Amino acid sequence: MTVTASGGSSLARPQLYQTVPGSTIVQAEQQDRFPQQGELRELSSYFQSGLKRLAIAEIITRNSDTIVSRAANRIFVGGSPLAYIERPKVDPRNLRSAEEQRAREAKLGTVTFVESSGGGGFFSGLTAALGGAGAVRIPSGFRPINVARYGPRNMQKSLRDMSWFLRYITYAIVAGDPNILVVNVRGLREIIEKACSTPATLVALQDMRATSAGYFRNDPEAQQLVKDYFDVLIREFEAPTPSLKQRQRFAEDQQGLALPQSYANAAERRPKFVIKSTLSTVEKNEAIKAAYRQVFERDITRAYSQKVSDLESKVKNGEISTKEFIRRLGKSPLYRQQFHDRFVNSRVIELAFRHFLGRGISSAEEFTRYFDLLSAKGFAALIDALVDSQEYADYFGEETVPYLRGLGQEAQECRNWGVQQELFKYSAPFVKVPQFVTLFGEYKQPLLDQHPYGAGNDPLEIQFGAIFPSRTVNNRTNPAPFGKDTRRLLVSKGGVNNQVGSAAFQQSGTTPTKIFKLTQVAAGSSSIRSKSVGNPSIRQTESTTQAVIRAAYRQVFGRDLYEGQRLTVPEIKLENGEITVREFVRQIAKSETFRKLYWNNLYVVKAVEYIHRRLLGRPTTGRAEINAYFDISAKKGFYALVDAILDSPEYIAAFGEDTVPYERYITPKGLALRSVRGLEASEKVKASLRPAAGAQERRPEVGRR
């Protein structure tokens, strides 16, 4: 299977619903201004009512079971609906005593008044019929649902849905905006009709409204607030399911996509500006500033006191349309200086798509068409082609200022997801590399042999310490989509030869890896207790044991340790034969010095990769292997990771008990890093400067040129 590049996984947090503070601040931020007086008053009013909103939500939440059960008794017969309510587990420490609850309600003026389960008798029904606070209008076609026929599973789902409706009410009250009801309730009617009954659901919602409002009879303002949000809930439930928001296609190479209407309702509201002759001067100025922000990515009149000749007066007087105003801004010397002269043609096209169509390049074929146009006819022809396109006419027309068609505005393509999110950022003009073209080119080439979680997680394959290359490209926006079955290509190095290794690697004249193996000799005897096969061993004497210890330190730490950092107790035990080399490696790998150097200061993925190379002598091969180490590190910690590597069958087969770990495999990139091509070229240059054999070397004469 060929693994190619990915469209990117740029982190996106789509907005789930609107809130009063968020909507107000976003509107001011999008228009590059301070909040206006009306917006500040709205924020002030919202924050002043914050305690009341929290108290309302708390009372409804505390009595949610009663509210839901009363509504269920209205629409279900032949059983007890309360038995099917799924109650979440509540921490006893969070429960308040009844006295504290009554005291708080008395202080707030929200003492509970709830009707009995019998329904309140004749006068209660008369109040409902006259349209009081507890009025429930029975829709046509309503019939109570039999619990036995409906079934336990459907009962649980229905009561769960009623609890969700009530929860949405509390969320909307706290947020100060009913948008969360619009997003989550509109379109549910057709789904509920398949399992339940729409008239029954409407009766239940009205009963929940009446019961909830009854808890605030002493506070008319809170009661009206609750009723208003329930009215929005009922109105959105009755509304038909909205249609999908289709993305228009203007070429066969573009993706035809659809965005659910709920996503568009939840997204941040992006104002659309138009310039008409009937608008006031203030409105025209706001639209012109929006055009500057879209085309130049900033308000040039405010930030730099710059203007584009007399275009503003012409568009205000109706001499030119908004479309023509945008065209002339794109052809102005200022735009050419800012977004053409400093970039290569590929990046010029990418920025032009953002400024005039509000999106990124869709495909390589689309880029090729506009690149050919720019190369053949120049920059002005590119602007004309974008502004005169059918896409521009359908989205913006003659009067609308272009806007960014990003997340929530319309469906986004997956093949350019990451780079398009980057193009919409403020830092886009500072990126010189053509991101879209680079991505489309990577689609046609297999991925490089690199770390499955990004090339920046591979340390430089040198001896001294964990040095990782600095990455200028964010790994989240340029991921490596390796599958779980993809394995890295490793180059055999040292004393390991198998079907993956190549005999051509061991060339004549190269120095093989020196293997340190501690062979213990019985005292007073010449017999060897542990024989060495294939490689010379070091007998256990004081000098040779110190050589093994130094080799272990260099392999595990990458360098010799200072005297104060050495582990004297494990060294003595190794010299006395109390522990094996494997146990000695385990103890120095678990030392505080090693942990501080290669675990505490590194991300987990980098730490696991480096420790694996030091202890097992090779890089990790793929996601399956490194994910297993992630699981061990997360559940059992650092010491369990070291034990898992040293106790693995691979370690025992490769090194056994008495061999110091050594580098067995390296990556192709590491092999290229150690190449002697540069040294060979340097020697050739030096040889060319030496005098020929037998020639007499002359001293240069001073003063002659």
From Swiss-Prot:
Membrane topology per record: Peripheral membrane protein
Enzyme Commission identifier(s): 4.-.-.-
Locations listed in the record: Cellular thylakoid membrane
UniProt keyword list: Antenna complex, Bile pigment, Chromophore, Electron transport, Lyase, Membrane, Photosynthesis, Phycobilisome, Repeat, Thylakoid, Transport
Annotated region (Phycobilin-like 2), positions in chain: 146-238
GO molecular function: lyase activity
Region of interest: Phycobilin-like 1: 18-76
Region of interest (Disordered), residue spans: 685-705
GO cellular component: phycobilisome; plasma membrane-derived thylakoid membrane
Positions of transmembrane segments: none
Gene Ontology BP terms: photosynthesis
Catalytic EC class: lyase
All residue ranges annotated as the PBS-linker domain in the record: 253-433, 514-691
Residues bound to (2R,3E)-phycocyanobilin: C196
InterPro entries: Globin-like_sf (IPR009050), PBS_linker_dom (IPR001297), PBS_linker_sf (IPR038255), Phycobilisome_asu/bsu (IPR012128), Phycobilisome_asu/bsu_sf (IPR038719)
Main location: membrane
Compositional bias annotation for Basic and acidic residues: 696-705
Region annotated Phycobilin-like loop, chain positions: 77-145
PTM statement from Swiss-Prot or TrEMBL: Contains one covalently linked bilin chromophore. This protein autochromophorylates.
Domain of life: Bacteria
Assigned protein family: Belongs to the phycobilisome linker protein family.
Function summary: This protein is postulated to act both as terminal energy acceptor (by its phycobilin-like domains) and as a linker polypeptide (by its repeats and arms) that stabilizes the phycobilisome core architecture. Has intrinsic bilin lyase activity.
Summary of subunit composition and partner proteins: Phycobilisomes of this organism are composed of a two cylinder core, from which six rods radiate. The core is mainly composed of allophycocyanin alpha and beta chains, and of three minor components: the allophycocyanin alpha-B chain, a 18.3 kDa polypeptide, and the anchor polypeptide L-CM.
Name this protein carries in UniProt: Phycobiliprotein ApcE
Native organism: Synechococcus sp. (strain ATCC 27144 / PCC 6301 / SAUG 1402/1) (Anacystis nidulans)
